[in-house]
Amino acid sequence: MENFEIYRKALALEPLEVEKAMQIYRTAPLAELMLVADTLRRKQVPDPQVVTWQIDRNVNITNVCISGCKFCNFHCKPHQTDRAYITTIEEYDRKIRETLALGGDQLLLQGGLHPKLGIDFYEELFRELKHRFPTLRLHALGAPEVAHIARISRLDYETTLKRLMAAGLDSLPGAGAEILDNGVRKAIS
């Protein structure tokens, strides 16, 4: 196990640096990752009959998208002002308060590939949400959104992710067509 020290940190619930996370992403055998993940799960929830879940809320950042996928709701073009939206901070505030009142502690933020929402928009949004709700976890932006933000902001992926994390991003969801087989993805998007 060449990644033993990284696994030890994970099992001790110590945060991983981006470089270490990239190292295990590039080099760790899947079986090792599964073993570490299961060990960590058993450590946190020893009873094998107990399953836990996350209470969160999905809030769409915008429905404006230049991608043109056939399967999702992020389909408005910027000029379609009668249907296009960007969620306001007041709407976030209301929805987060509702979520917290129900025992939730995480916000899942996703949206389309808006041609005018670059890194500055997301940094400001994440900082404001964390300022208002410091304990809220932000689980936000799929891989296509991060790539889009990087491209229109003229940044590399690593810089984009580091800046988003510094602004309050806690984790990335794995969702959308990017998780599908290449042939299926091409057919539907």
Regions found by a protein language model. Give the residues of each.
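Auxiliary Fe-S-binding modules of radical SAM enzymes
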Residues: 1-31, 94, 100-101
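Residue-level signal for pocket-adjacent positions within structured domains
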Residues: 11, 19-20, 48, 54, ...
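Conserved Radical SAM active-site core
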Residues: 76-189
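Flexible, active-site-adjacent loop/turn segments at secondary-structure boundaries
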Residues: 14, 57-59, 72, 178, ...
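Conserved short loop/turn motifs at secondary-structure junctions
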Residues: 21-24, 55-58, 111-115
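Secondary-structure boundary motif
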Residues: 12, 26, 43-46, 101, ...
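N-terminal pre-triad scaffold of radical SAM enzymes
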Residues: 34-78, 84-108
